[in-house]
């Protein structure tokens, strides 16, 4: 199987083309294994579609399916344009709906669409939380010190609410820093696009930031978010790493 390795804002992905849908959960788990496979946060399968430029199947590191992945969507768009020669202005189908993307060399902007849902704040484990769905569910906690991030606490919240868990610090009205515990990876990752989007949207909703901000995830690779016309936009660099053939075990 020919595959392509991509990185976006600290998340890494294995991407391949296929001509039909099928359950690739076991394959995803094998490929994403960092010791016995290629190693990645997620596995993306690009499929043909009659109406849109393409459709994807997205698998988490543990082989589970996910409706959406922000950084994965940017990597998929970069791949579709640079490898599959699709128009730089494209739309593709995900489990969370249609994603629009614009590719400009190594920069990719995607529209994550309208926010699916926001719930009221609540207190648990000594912290204030709010749940926001940006294609997948995210718990968000605003803090003064990101060293408060606790993997064990995040694990408890993730298991109880079946959601990703984010800690966010507001540096000023134009800049946030975020750390994320990702469902499906079951650990902190270097970045999470939909998680950063949830943090930005809740900060904007609570009038703590402007409608356009920079966000720095754990990777240190700064990305941009904007909210306009009731849609969430996400832009940053994407890196093509390498391509190779994989022999199945």
UniProtKB/Swiss-Prot annotation:
Pfam families found in the cross-reference section: DAP_epimerase
Job of this protein: Catalyzes the stereoinversion of LL-2,6-diaminopimelate (L,L-DAP) to meso-diaminopimelate (meso-DAP), a precursor of L-lysine and an essential component of the bacterial peptidoglycan.
Keyword vocabulary terms for this entry: Amino-acid biosynthesis, Cytoplasm, Isomerase, Lysine biosynthesis
Official protein name in the record: Diaminopimelate epimerase
GO biological process: one example: lysine biosynthetic process via diaminopimelate
InterPro entries: DAP_epimerase_AS, DAP_epimerase_DapF
Catalytic activity, as annotated: (2S,6S)-2,6-diaminopimelate = meso-2,6-diaminopimelate
Amino-acid positions noted as binding substrate in the UniProt annotation, renumbered to this chain: 11, 60, 70-71, 164, 182-183, 193-194
């Amino acid at each position: 199987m020919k595959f392509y390795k991509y990185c976006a804002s600290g998340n890494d992905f294995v991407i391949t083309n296929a001509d039909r849908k099928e359950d690739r959960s076991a394959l995803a788990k094998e490929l994403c294994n960092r010791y016995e496979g290629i190693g990645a946060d997620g596995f993306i399968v690009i499929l043909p579609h009659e109406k849109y430029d393409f459709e994807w199947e997205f698998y988490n590191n543990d082989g589970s399916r996910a409706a959406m992945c922000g950084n994965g969507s940017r990597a998929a768009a970069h791949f579709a344009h640079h490898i599959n020669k699709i128009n730089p202005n494209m739309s593709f189908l995900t489990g969370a709906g249609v994603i629009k993307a614009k590719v400009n060399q190594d920069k990719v902007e995607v529209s994550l669409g309208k926010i699916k849902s926001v719930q009221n704040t609540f207190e648990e484990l000594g912290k204030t939380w709010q749940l926001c769905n940006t294609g997948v569910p995210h718990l968000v906690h605003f803090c003064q010190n990101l060293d408060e991030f606790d993997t064990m606490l995040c694990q408890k919240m993730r298991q109880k609410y079946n959601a990703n868990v984010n800690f966010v610090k507001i540096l000023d009205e134009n800049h946030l820093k975020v750390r994320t515990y990702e469902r499906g990876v079951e650990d902190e990752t270097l970045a999470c696009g939909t998680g950063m989007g949830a943090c930005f949207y809740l900060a904007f909703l609570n009038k703590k930031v402007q409608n356009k901000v920079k966000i720095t995830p754990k990777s240190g690779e700064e990305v941009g978010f904007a909210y306009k016309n009731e849609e969430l936009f996400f832009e940053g660099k994407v890196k093509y790493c390498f391509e190779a053939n994989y022999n199945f075990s």
